[in-house]
């Protein structure tokens, strides 16, 4: 497939008060929630106005307590985070990692531990040897009713108007070992999973839906290597899914251009370009995205930690400083 955009960059847009200046953090233990609580005032003072808290299974779920992580954050902790974010005018968005990333290293996460029949590769890869991460089967009729209950609990606890559903790096999909998915089109399977969540979150619950964008990009045509784009057939899903989803378009290396930003914009999506720990790469991504700043669907910037926050983080993180300075004062 060809993923080419005719949308051309222009001069940096004027400063916009509504730019999202976001931070993605892992909040998967009680201690992580405590640190985030201490850091919220500092993050807000540094310019952060959106925090995406990746919780996944690490909340004291009531509907399915068997799916709680080892040290889940409590409802009371979430209530304090909500109050603090509201006080400091920070939008707090929970994240629940859907479809892929159902394991890490040798640890399989609660859903596939408690319900192994949901696994896309049932009975294969003992100790997760030989794979990156497990996935659940997008066609299993019993998986969505369970995970949607978890999403609903997070939305209610966080009093959230949006949910990030992850869906990055889904490498196991349409596998021959799955009796339901074998032989089926992987883009259609991926699109179905996305549309199922969209139906529940956006249409039924009336909240915004965010997701990572890498599996919607075709590595052969767009020029991204490695993890930033897909080579397993999921990319055509970009034309099969609702365009009111917010795409978090992550790129962690320095480049002259980032063609996925105009591609997603031209397709009709709102885009939140996303960086990690390389300050020069973050600056390059922010600067390139600002060439499309006159389009309000280019929402701003998201800085990721891919770990729990640390005390003093708000004063020390260079990517946060770069994003704040450039988005508030585009040159």
Residues covered by each model-derived region:
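Substrate-binding cleft of secreted/luminal carbohydrate-active enzymes
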Residues: 272-331
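Active-site-adjacent "subsite" loops/lids of carbohydrate-active enzymes
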Residues: 99-153, 273
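Glycine-rich, aromatic-flanked loop segments that form ligand/cofactor-binding clefts
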Residues: 18-22, 42-55, 82-124
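Short, acidic/polar
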Residues: 29-44, 149-150, 255-261, 282-288
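Active-site neighborhood of glycoside hydrolase catalytic domains
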Residues: 141-269, 280
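The substrate-binding groove and active-site-proximal loops of carbohydrate-active enzymes
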Residues: 21-31, 63-75, 128-145, 179-189, ...
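Aromatic-lined carbohydrate-binding/catalytic grooves of carbohydrate-active enzymes
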Residues: 44-77
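Hydrophobic faces of well-ordered beta-strands that scaffold small-molecule active sites
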Residues: 19-25, 51-53, 92-96, 163-165, ...
